Amino acid sequence: MLSAQLDEYLAEMNLSATEQQKKQLIGFVEMLNKWNKAYNLTSIRDPQQMLIRHIMDSLAVSPHLVGERFIDVGTGPGLPGIPLAIMNPDKTFVLLDSLGKRIRFQKQVQHELGIKNISSVESRVEAYQPETKFDGVLSRAFASIEDMLHWCHHLPTDDGCYYALKGQLAEDEMEKLPEEFEVTDVIELKVPRLDEQRHLLRVIKK
């Protein structure tokens, strides 16, 4: 059932995936559903809704990623980082979260599904000092873009980019950005079977 739905949704989004990638995406949903019963990793309980709201919602960002090295801040159970890593084996992703149970889940996913291009780090963002900075800083965890830029300012390279995943856009939010930052793109994301607004904002330092 999930497999047929995944094929349908990927086709609607014009995304191509190998059989191995599809198997990993479905495996991730199945593991999330299983672990969620004990660890409360997401408020979504239905695997079909997980596929839409977590997997496809994450994958909508995939065509817009530029660079090779990314960090997903406040990743929770690995969203959007794990689905993006599965679909982009040529890129590397650091998954950052401060809760140990989420990191344990991510490491189990990495082990069981054989995902080679992710590394999970248990840390608060302000305490995390990477040896190498990132081409892209991703997050759907922050309440505002202003907060994201404040807490993640030390993570991107000089020409790196922030990718803020948002629902409905608040116009005043972009007006509150510090003057040294610029929103280069506001992309409306289309997620199959999700009748809610989704946007990706790309922000750079001037």
From Swiss-Prot:
S-adenosyl-L-methionine binds at G74, L79, V125, E126, R140. One of its GO terms (cellular component) is cytosol. It is found in: Cytoplasm. It comes from the Bacteria. Its EC number is 2.1.1.170. The keyword rRNA processing applies. InterPro entries: rRNA_ssu_MeTfrase_G, SAM-dependent_MTases_sf. It catalyses: guanosine(527) in 16S rRNA + S-adenosyl-L-methionine = N(7)-methylguanosine(527) in 16S rRNA + S-adenosyl-L-homocysteine. Keywords: Cytoplasm, Methyltransferase, rRNA processing, S-adenosyl-L-methionine, Transferase. The keyword Cytoplasm applies. GO terms for molecular function: rRNA (guanine-N7-)-methyltransferase activity. Specifically methylates the N7 position of guanine in position 527 of 16S rRNA. NCBIfam families: rsmG_gidB. Belongs to the methyltransferase superfamily. RNA methyltransferase RsmG family. This is Ribosomal RNA small subunit methyltransferase G. It comes from Shewanella sediminis (strain HAW-EB3). The gene is rsmG.
